[in-house]
Amino acid sequence: MIALLFGEAITIFLSTQSKKREVVDFLKELNNLLGKDDFDIDTDLILIRKRKPDDEEHSTPFTLLDLDYDAWDIVDRLKELTVEEYSESKIDKDDLAPPLLFVFGKNISGKLVYIKLKIKGDQKKRILCVSFHYAKEPMTFPYA
């Protein structure tokens, strides 16, 4: 959502807290998809690798390079996610099918990594990982 404040446009991200049961169900579905025999990392995991020239350290490409990670390392970290690492849910203003993005914070090599993802599709489900980068702000964990 974009709002005007003193004549300047600012972007507002709508945040909510999913119920614990919803997070558990999301993680079960995520692990089922990642554990399928026919899981194809090239088509079943969509990883957004957008650079942030104004904040490179908090971008997915920088974090992957710093951790020496590839897509399979991300899959391994996604399989490890727990309810206790859940932080919040955000409304995906760019794609309302489904509208919720689940946000997790995971300690990797002594640094907090911000992970934002959702599961898309009806017949053929895919994992959309919008963010996998070092956390810019402190995170809260309602179920820790």
Can you annotate each of these PLM segments?
Residues 6, 11-21, 25-98:
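Compact soluble domain cores
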Residues 79-126:
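Functional cores of ribonucleases/endoribonucleases
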Residues 69-72, 86, 114, 134, ...:
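Sequence-level detector for tyrosine residue identity
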Residues 119-144:
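Enriched for short, Lys/Arg-rich terminal
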